[in-house]
Amino acid sequence: AKVIGCVNHDANAIASHAANHPDAMHFTEDIRTLELSPLIAHIAKMRKLYPDAFVVLWASLECTNFSKAKGGQPRDADSRTLAEHLFRYIEAINPDYIQIENVEEFMSWGDLDENGKPISKDAGRLYQQWVANVCGYGYRFVHRILNSADYGAYTSRRRFFGIFAKGSLPIVFPEPTHSKEGAAGLFGRLHRW
């Protein structure tokens, strides 16, 4: 895989990404307002250089205002709409795959009341509508809730991972490499967290 671009409003996040992917094009911008022309041109250039490659759009959407860690605090309605801004990227770059990472409560995305609190009877309504809208661009969708520690991360957080794939492209999630207790099995060993 070759990472060719990154958009993030946080300069520290961009600096970290640039250190790990120095050949990628970096934009320290808000995804809602980024002028897409340079990104579109860069992707077109990469498609010519690598005509058999798949274009994957990875989005780690802001999660603070979905997370249960927010407790009973009011949510920022604007921050909860960042997923809606994905559509202009889909239309501009027509990726083969879209991969999403977020807190598992992202699936409960629904309306807020006048005090900024989630309306329980609407839990999941906006999420389901959003998934249907992305699928309307010709994608199929599968999601999983995965524990990052099962894949070698130094934290044991359960996270939402969603994959949208065009047409008949395969959707595959990785097999775990670790487990809480570790295990030896017929097909290999799972390392202990």
Where are these regions (language model features)?
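SAM cofactor-binding core of SAM-dependent methyltransferases
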Residues: 1-35
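Short glycine-rich loop/turn motifs that provide flexible caps or phosphate-binding loops at active sites
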Residues: 4, 59, 151
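Anionic group-transfer/hydrolysis microenvironments
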Residues: 10, 32, 62, 103-104
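Residue-level recognition of the N-termini of beta-strands and the immediately preceding loop/turn
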Residues: 2-4, 53-56
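Class I S-adenosyl-L-methionine
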Residues: 37-53, 63-193
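Redox-cofactor binding/interface segments in oxidoreductases and associated redox assembly factors
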Residues: 29, 58-59, 100
